[in-house]
């Protein structure tokens, strides 16, 4: 992030990281740089720590995948393939965008999985 801020001293619109930890780290690195006050910091994975960072005002949003649906659709496609059926080239397993409005609900949902 230091390199980005050095190369773009006037700020940029969005930082889109490959995962939540990288997005949170980038947001924290830019925290004291006023040129980045309006930058959107986006992570991927929908981790509890990212949702908490959203509630704390550190991260703008994250995108959460649904691992159950990803696995289910993968097995479903494999069965279709093994049965000689045509398999879609692209299979969308869905996602959820987690923002300040939905972060607490997302945290509660993830925590409920470990309570079962």
Question: What is the predicted role of each segment?
Answer:
Residues 1-116:
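A residue-level marker of the well-folded mature domains of exported/periplasmic proteins
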């Amino acid at each position: 992030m230091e390199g980005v801020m050095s190369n773009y001293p006037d700020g940029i619109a969005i930082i889109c990281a490959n995962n939540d930890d990288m997005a949170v780290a980038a947001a924290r690195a830019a925290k004291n740089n006023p040129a980045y006050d309006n930058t959107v910091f986006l992570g991927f994975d929908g981790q509890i720590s990212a949702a908490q960072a959203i509630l704390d005002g550190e991260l703008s949003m994250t995108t959460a995948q649904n691992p159950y649906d990803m696995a289910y659709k993968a097995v479903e496609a494999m069965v279709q393939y093994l049965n000689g059926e045509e398999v879609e080239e692209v299979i969308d397993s869905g996602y959820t965008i987690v923002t300040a409005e939905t972060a607490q609900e997302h945290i509660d949902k993830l925590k409920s999985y470990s309570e079962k």
